[in-house]
Structures are given as structure tokens and as C-alpha cells.
């Protein structure tokens, strides 16, 4: 059982919508006017898996669960849209969709984006509609995470690739226990909704049980989650001296962890996030 599952209750779509609209009201990440240092690094480290694992052809569509990344500055699925592919996003929050839509229009990419207001536990697509399906930090927020794997599988063409990112309970920097602490003091729901944490074996076995082949597990975002939170908090004050000090002090630390992560060693399985790939 993934860590944290006992804390979950079944959520209706309306409850999930209220939760994520509430996150928007409190999140300083969603109100940033420019990417933070770790936003750029997060995006670069995630995109390397698209390059490694996916080869979608022009005319094929990509599916992404939730639109949070595109409503902030990590913008993972821009990788596909900037290469001429259409991306369907499924998100339960009208607010997040509107924020992402404005960003995409400003970036000249909205013609390739197709947001759908829906619950990603029950995808509204015909089977075999997509060449690639992906989710990053999505399915751990719902108890029916196995249903989400099955839904992504069904929506993907035979031979298509499904990529899923989930929090890592084995994270060296104790992401799970940091979330437990934030939950205890009542701060977690202002940043995100409750989330499950997985071991590499759990998410690998879940993909195999869902019928995927060629399953591969890796990790991404090796640097401390606490530095990520600090970076995002400081980004609220881009013109203050604290932001300039952050750039001088944090940049070399993040660069060191990025170099280590790109060496693709077993240390990646201690990263903040696990990423798993399976082929339908």
C-alpha cells in the first residue's frame, strides 16, 4: 500500500474541484510572473525522459493528466506542442485551465492545446486515441490511482507509451515526512492536496499489473525538496536582495545535483519523484 493511503477518502469531482481552486487561492507558485531557478531545472530534467522514451509522429495526439504544470512555469507538455503535436489536458479545475490557457496564448501555443474540464479518473476519450499519455504528480492525489493507470492505458494506442511520475517515499531528503509535518500544522492543503508516496517496486508492479510491457523505473529531481520550496517562496520577491542572494547561492547547488542526476545512477531512485514508463 503506498504511504499515506490511510489518510485518503474518496473524493467526488466537485470536491476535487473545490480543493484545487483553493490551492490556486493560496499558492504563490501559481502567481509567479517569471520562472524560478528550479522551475527551469525541473522542466529540463523531466523533458529528458520524453526525448528518451517517446517518438510520436506528427498527427498523433498526446494526453496529459492535469494542467497544473502548464499553469505554472514547469510547462512539461510544451515539449510536445513546440514540436507541432496536439496535447489534450484533462483537469478538474476550471480555474487552473483558465490560468494555463492565458499562459499558452501568450506563448503562442494555444492552437496546439486542448484543455478538457473533467475528472481524470474517468477519461472522456475513445480507446486508442493517443500516441503518448503522461502524468506528473497527478495520480497520487486520488485513491483510485490504479484506475488512472488503466484509463491512461486504454486511451493510448497499441504500442504507445505511458509515462507516470509519482512521489518517492524513499527520497533521501524525506519528502514524505516533510509532507506529514506540513499536514500536521495545517499548511499542506494550502500548497497541494494530500498525496500518496510510492516505492520503486510498488509503481513498477502496478504498471505490470495494468498490462504494460517494457516497464522502466527511474527517478528525477534529486535535489532537496526543501530547496525547491524555498526557491518558490523567494520568487515572490524578484526585485529584492533576497532573490539576488538566492541566485548566487542556490544556482551552484542545483547545478551539482543536476549533473549527478544526469549520470543516471542508482542514486536517482532516491530522488524526490519516481518516473515509470510502460508500453501498451
Give names to the regions the model predicted:
Residues 216-280:
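A C-terminal cap/extension of S-adenosyl-L-methionine-dependent methyltransferases
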Residues 146-161:
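A short glycine-rich, Lys/Arg-flanked "PGG" loop and its adjoining helix->strand segment in the class I
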Residues 185-202:
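Acceptor-substrate binding/catalytic loop of class I
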Residues 2-58, 79, 96, 108, 161-186:
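Conserved class I S-adenosyl-L-methionine
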Residues 134:
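A conserved beta-strand element that flanks and buttresses the S-adenosyl-L-methionine
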Residues 61-122:
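Class I SAM-dependent methyltransferase SAM/SAH-binding core
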Amino acid at each position: 500500500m503506498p504511504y499515506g493511503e490511510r489518510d485518503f477518502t474518496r473524493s467526488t469531482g466537485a470536491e476535487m474541484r473545490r480543493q484545487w481552486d483553493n490551492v490556486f487561492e493560496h499558492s504563490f507558485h501559481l502567481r509567479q510572473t517569471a520562472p524560478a531557478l528550479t522551475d527551469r531545472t525541473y522542466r529540463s530534467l523531466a523533458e529528458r525522459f520524453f526525448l528518451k522514451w517517446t517518438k510520436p509522429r506528427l498527427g498523433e495526439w498526446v494526453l496529459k493528466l492535469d494542467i497544473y504544470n502548464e499553469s505554472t512555469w514547469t510547462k512539461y507538455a510544451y515539449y510536445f506542442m513546440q514540436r507541432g503535436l496536439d496535447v489534450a489536458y484533462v483537469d478538474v479545475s476550471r480555474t487552473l485551465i483558465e490560468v494555463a490557457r492565458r499562459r499558452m496564448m501568450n506563448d503562442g501555443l494555444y492552437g496546439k492545446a486542448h484543455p478538457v474540464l473533467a475528472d481524470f479518473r474517468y477519461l472522456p476519450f475513445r480507446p486508442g486515441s493517443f500516441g503518448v499519455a503522461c502524468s506528473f504528480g497527478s495520480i497520487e492525489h486520488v485513491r483510485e490511482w490504479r484506475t488512472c493507470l488503466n484509463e491512461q492505458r486504454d486511451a493510448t494506442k497499441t504500442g504507445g507509451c505511458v509515462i507516470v511520475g509519482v512521489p518517492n517515499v524513499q527520497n533521501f531528503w524525506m519528502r514524505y515526512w516533510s509532507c506529514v509535518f506540513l499536514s500536521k500544522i495545517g499548511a499542506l492543503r494550502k500548497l497541494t492536496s494530500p498525496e500518496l508516496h510510492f516505492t520503486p517496486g510498488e509503481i513498477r508492479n502496478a504498471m505490470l499489473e495494468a498490462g504494460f510491457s517494457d516497464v522502466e523505473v527511474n527517478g528525477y529531481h534529486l535535489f532537496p525538496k526543501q530547496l525547491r520550496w524555498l526557491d518558490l517562496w523567494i520568487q515572490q520577491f524578484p526585485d529584492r536582495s533576497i532573490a539576488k542572494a538566492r541566485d548566487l547561492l542556490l544556482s551552484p547547488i542545483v547545478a551539482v545535483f543536476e549533473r549527478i542526476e544526469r549520470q543516471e545512477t542508482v542514486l536517482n531512485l532516491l530522488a524526490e519523484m519516481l518516473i515509470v514508463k510502460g508500453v501498451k
